[in-house]
Amino acid sequence: GRLSKSFKQSYSMLNKGSISIIIWATMLFIFGFTIMHAVFILYTGMPLSDGGLGYNEAQNGRIFAVIGIAGIVTQGVLIGPLSRKLGARRMLPLSCFICGTGLVLIPYTQAEYATVQLVLVAIIVAVGSGLFQPSSSSLLTTFAKHEGINLGIVMGAQESVSSFARIL
């Protein structure tokens, strides 16, 4: 009945031109960001002798606090001016590049400078993520209106694939 119809409508968004590209990009972005959370703890918590950083739970917690604070600053301060200057269409790939750069830099942190390096990398990752979410939602809204597609269906499809990416 209704659930089946809702699922079919959401699934149909995965084949709708510009909308599907953003939805798939969102899925890949969320998947990568979720994997970072899991693997980051393994890397930082691994003993120095095994190639990790030997961090404890409190040290990891501080790094994740930096990610959270940087995300708040990004969405509370940076997103407005950058959106007006660049627009969502340019910010989406820029946000992927920024976040991707941060993710690539994580394994290159060196134990003797780990805290400073990880704080900088965490800020880079958080800024990229903080720019991605609003940009992708804004673009989806614009494309849905332009193509005359129900906004609820489009946003529901985006949230569905985001949830699926977190499960993977």
Language-model features and meaning:
Residues 114-132:
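Hydrophobic core of transmembrane alpha-helices in multi-pass small-molecule transporters
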Residues 73-88:
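Helix-to-loop junctions at the C-terminal end of transmembrane segments
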Residues 147-168:
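A late C-terminal transmembrane helix in Major Facilitator Superfamily
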Residues 97-112:
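C-terminal ends and interior cores of transmembrane alpha-helices
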Residues 15-40, 123:
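Pair of pore-lining "gating" transmembrane helices in MFS-fold secondary transporters
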Residues 38-60:
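Short amphipathic helix-loop junctions that connect adjacent transmembrane helices
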Residues 1-24, 46, 50:
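Juxtamembrane intracellular "pre-TM" segments in multi-pass secondary transporters
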Residues 130-147:
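Intracellular juxtamembrane helix-capping segments at the cytosolic ends
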